[in-house]
């Protein structure tokens, strides 16, 4: 066993009853792995939008201010009444953060499965990754090839498996093409590459000409700019050409989900040979999987007939539904294509302490396309 420190620096997020959110670092006792567990030195962990939902939640980050405790940084921000209602279930509980990461196994329980991972570079899933070390069951780690850069291994789960889950869902629900929003993101670029390899027509929605060029540059065929005056016309044309009847929306709020359903219906009506006042009988599905826009989701159901659905999508329930065989195949593909299809790009690397700099926190909480932060707990 590697000589280990006695404590493990860990990031915590706490909502206080008086209407404040506090994010801090705390030195906790170093965990000891049980027989079927491994202790991993966390070398890299991405900041994903799903992490930010827990990290800052409904806090007003424009009110964030800095302090210290035991020589470690603390961020405090005010939480408006609506945010307190949304986070009522976590008031008073200091929660750990970080869905995924990558590191080296430095200690292991005495089971053969755990011992076999000693010294290996592994990808991690299971929360509490914004820490120097993480102890977790062997089934929650995925061995990576020798020499894997921790920055590549850090994002093995959330974005790669979510993008693959989109194409699997498309097949399972008998669709043949996809519409995707916020498509210039790391996840969006992965989906472009997956669909190109698998021959799946993909309509990409972005919000600037610069993002159009990014996706065109990696081979995307259908890219439409939601800020353009002719957005709806171009979206309908792309859906007519592809036949897309399923969409995945990362924005969540606003009118985009409704616009996608409207465009799908317009494309379906073009194929109808007989008029119906109830609209087409083509089933149209949009799943919301993100919350980049925190405003209410708005749409007019009269715009897309009566054969449609709008729902939520989360990776974990999908994997439970898909089963071990499908998930195993997805994981193998991620490892096989880790430095190609599923390579993530980071604009900033920060330490645990740097992540609690107020200006830095406000920057990564803005969730700007093209900006992705990687936490390196050991520098």
Protein language model features and the residues they cover:
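C-terminal substrate-binding/catalytic core of Rossmann-like NAD(P)-dependent dehydrogenases/reductases
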Residues: 232-236, 240-241, 290-348
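Glycine-rich beta-strand-centered segment in the early N-terminal region that forms part
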Residues: 31-46, 60-126
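A structural motif shared across PLP-dependent enzymes of the aminotransferase-like
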Residues: 126-139
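C-terminal hydrophobic helical "lid"/dimerization subdomain
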Residues: 2-6, 261, 266-272, 316-379
């Amino acid at each position: 066993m590697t000589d280990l420190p006695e404590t493990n620096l860990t990031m915590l997020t706490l909502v206080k009853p008086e209407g404040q959110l506090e994010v801090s670092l705390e030195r906790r006792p170093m965990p000891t792995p049980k027989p079927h567990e491994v202790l991993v030195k966390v070398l890299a962990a991405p900041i994903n939008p799903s992490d930010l939902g827990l990290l800052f939640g409904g806090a007003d980050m424009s009110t964030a201010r800095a302090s210290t405790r035991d020589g470690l940084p603390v961020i405090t921000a005010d939480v408006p009444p609506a945010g307190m209602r949304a986070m009522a279930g976590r008031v008073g509980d200091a929660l750990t953060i970080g869905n995924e990461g990558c590191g080296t196994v430095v200690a292991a329980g005495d089971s053969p499965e755990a011992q076999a991972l000693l010294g290996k570079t592994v990808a991690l899933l299971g929360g509490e990754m914004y820490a120097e070390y993480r102890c977790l069951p062997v089934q929650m780690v995925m061995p990576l090839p020798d020499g894997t850069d921790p920055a590549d291994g850090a994002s093995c789960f959330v974005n790669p498996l979510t993008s693959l889950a989109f194409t699997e869902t498309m097949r399972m629900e008998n669709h043949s093409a996809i519409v995707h929003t916020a498509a210039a993101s790391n996840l969006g670029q992965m989906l472009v590459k997956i669909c190109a390899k698998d021959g799946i027509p993909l309509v990409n929605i972005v919000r600037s000409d610069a993002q159009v060029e990014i996706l065109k540059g990696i081979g995307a065929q259908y890219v439409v700019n939601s800020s353009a005056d002719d957005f709806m016309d171009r979206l309908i044309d792309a859906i007519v050409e592809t036949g897309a009847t399923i969409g995945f929306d990362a924005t969540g709020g606003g009118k985009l989900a409704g616009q996608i359903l409207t465009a799908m219906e317009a494309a379906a009506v073009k194929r109808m040979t007989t008029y119906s006042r109830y609209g087409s009988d083509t089933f149209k599905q949009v799943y919301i999987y993100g919350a980049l826009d925190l405003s209410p989701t708005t749409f007019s159901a009269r715009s897309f007939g009566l054969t449609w659905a709008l729902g939520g999508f989360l990776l974990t329930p999908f994997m439970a539904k898909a089963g071990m065989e499908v998930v195993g195949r997805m994981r193998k593909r991620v490892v096989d294509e880790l430095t190609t299809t599923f390579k993530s790009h980071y604009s900033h690397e920060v330490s645990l302490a740097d992540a609690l700099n107020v200006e830095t926190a406000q920057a990564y909480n803005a969730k700007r396309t093209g900006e992705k932060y990687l936490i390196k707990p050991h520098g």
